[in-house]
Amino acid sequence: RSPALTDFIFMVKEKSHMFITGPDVVKTVTNEEVGKEELGGAYTHSSKSGVTHFMCDNEEETLMSIRELLSFLPSNNMEDAPLVPCNDDIHRQVEALQTVIPEDPNMPYDIKDIIEPVLDNQYFFEVMPHFAKNVVVGFGRLGGRSVGIVANQPAWLAGVLDIDASDKAARFIRFCDCFNIPLITFEDVPGFLPGTIQEHNGIIRHGAKIVYAYAEATVPKVTLITRKAYGGAYIVMSSKPTGADVNLAYPQAEIAVMGAAGAVNILYRKSTPEEKQEIIKDYEDKFSNPYCAAERGLIDEVIMPRDTRYKLIQALEMCHNKNQSNPPKKHGNMPL
């Protein structure tokens, strides 16, 4: 039986190994010399292949991590997400969120500085923390109810989507949908990673997995756009057109086909630098803001960062009795 058929895989550093063929067979067939740790150890599978979800230092830590993971999950796929008593004020404001996002839209920040403070007791249980770091996934609680978190990470590759990030996010989204766990998406995405490596390895096919997973999911889906939401990557990250139930945005959110500078350089390539700067400012005022999108029904509410926790809980309450079903099929045709 393949371990990849299980929902989550835990490995212990320097003790756990898995591979299709061991080092001896690899050397015999390909003449490549490689140790079992490099070939299929915990670090390899948690950071390079993405096969394992958790890498632990010892067996005791592994067992504790398994217990922690199970606390977020229902007993089976017919039950709702677990609801536990919440001693954290649902109206709690987080003033620090007002200054987390830099004024310069090209400056990075850690999306976990937004995720963690808004969750119950500021606790976030991250899944696959060492693989495809440009996307963050994991579990938390809001108002006592388990939620699945999917977020772009501006601190790693500017938060772009690539092949590995697409696979990581899509698999997690589908797991949450299987076990009735609501999805919270924190979006700050400038686009898909460009280049021949991505194109030749099928970024179109892999990128389609995220949009398929979101569109297929019937659990409550709440999205918060923290800063950038550009082009096709915006559509992919649980947007209104793909079936998101509630879409929120911060005042500095930029929802557009592309950034102002990129758009102006294409549309006004013959203009002088001075003229371009003036046009960029006009473009940003007209299009690179959440209010234009809100007028078109793509954003439900523009919120202040300090109110994020309550607004997310409020949105989940609105969707709690959501009843949506897909057309009767044995299964969908996921783009694999």
PLM segments and residue spans:
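Ligand-binding clefts of soluble mixed alpha/beta catalytic domains
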Residues: 1-336
